[in-house]
Amino acid sequence: MKNVRKIFTAIIEYDPEKKQYVGMVPDVPGVHTVGSSLEEVRRNLKEVLELVLEEAGDEINLQEFVALEMIEVET
């Protein structure tokens, strides 16, 4: 079976209270992690994503649509 390269959207935020980065891949349930740097959280996300996809095989339910939007409000 030939491997297929897929690209997923990751959301990474910085948590100033815990002084760490928090990352998630909204298309794939269960893919979230933390890291002390952007490089570490990216590496961790890739590792978790690969593990979840390998474990689930064809049974995973990927989201069909994920969007990032900028919403403007007055405060």
Swiss-Prot record:
Pfam families: UPF0150. GO terms for biological process: regulation of DNA-templated transcription. SUPFAM superfamilies: TTHA1013/TTHA0281-like. It comes from the Bacteria. Belongs to the UPF0150 family. This is UPF0150 protein TM_1313. It comes from Thermotoga maritima (strain ATCC 43589 / DSM 3109 / JCM 10099 / NBRC 100826 / MSB8).
